[in-house]
Amino acid sequence: MGMRMMFTVFLLVVLTTTVVSFPSDSASDVRDDEAKDERSDMYKSKRNGRCCHPACGKHFSCGR
């Protein structure tokens, strides 16, 4: 293959990868939003005054 042909194939691969990544990126944004809407276990345990996670364990008792 000549240099022009190799460059053309390279451009096609780059453009195809870019076009395919846009729809999957927006789908992952929706999943991120859904995950943020649900409250985490760590947050729930903070509301009850208990937390066994190392990040909040120094502020709350584990309750075990």
Curated annotation (Swiss-Prot):
GO terms for cellular component: extracellular region; host cell postsynaptic membrane. Disulfide bonds join C51-C56, C52-C62. Pfam families: Toxin_8. It is found in: Secreted. The modification Deamidated asparagine is found at N48. One of its GO terms (molecular function) is acetylcholine receptor inhibitor activity. InterPro entries: Conotoxin_a-typ, Conotoxin_a-typ_CS. Residues 1-21 form the signal peptide. Its main location: secreted. Residues 22-47 form a propeptide. Alpha-conotoxins act on postsynaptic membranes, they bind to the nicotinic acetylcholine receptors (nAChR) and thus inhibit them. Found in injectable (milked) (IV) venom. The cysteine framework is I (CC-C-C). Alpha3/5 pattern. This is Alpha-conotoxin CnIC. It comes from Conus consors. The lineage of its organism: Eukaryota, Metazoa, Spiralia, Lophotrochozoa, Mollusca.
